[in-house]
């Protein structure tokens, strides 16, 4: 394994809600692919501890989803806060991609980046300023070639590592059926 500036860093966060001023990160996962979307390594999947008071602020959808997946219990049991999760993630990424080289990759990744900027600024700064957002291709396909949309189905577990794997697979699907490389 050696750091390669062409590798891509994929990330997904699970949060208590969508507002970084009010809500918090409760899970983070990363993986690294090469430029052809082959998964090279999966980083740690970390439940980020939050207080019972913070968890009580979740809306009904988040309570149902994160309780059903077991994430709420993992968050309560976790001993890792934001900073510890950030450092563990950075330690993994530094083995695979030099700082400032990979765009931040994922689905609706701008939302995740807002939370990173607020709660994990060192990790946020590790990425290039560009985005590789799979949801952009989905939106374009919806408008320009809607017949391909039914060809890829997500499981929607709302577990960070599952979601990242699906994002990589979804981009590969669009590469084959929409971009046609």
UniProtKB/Swiss-Prot annotation:
GO terms for biological process: DNA metabolic process. It is found in: Cytoplasm. Its EC number is 3.1.15.-. Residues 8-171 form the Exonuclease domain. GO terms for molecular function: 3'-5'-RNA exonuclease activity; nucleic acid binding. SMART domains: EXOIII. The active site is at 129. GO terms for cellular component: cytoplasm. Pfam families: RNase_T. Keywords: Cytoplasm, Exonuclease, Hydrolase, Nuclease. It comes from the Bacteria. 3'-to-5' exoribonuclease specific for small oligoribonucleotides. Belongs to the oligoribonuclease family. Homodimer. This is Oligoribonuclease. It comes from Escherichia coli O157:H7. The lineage of its organism: Bacteria, Pseudomonadati, Pseudomonadota, Gammaproteobacteria, Enterobacterales.
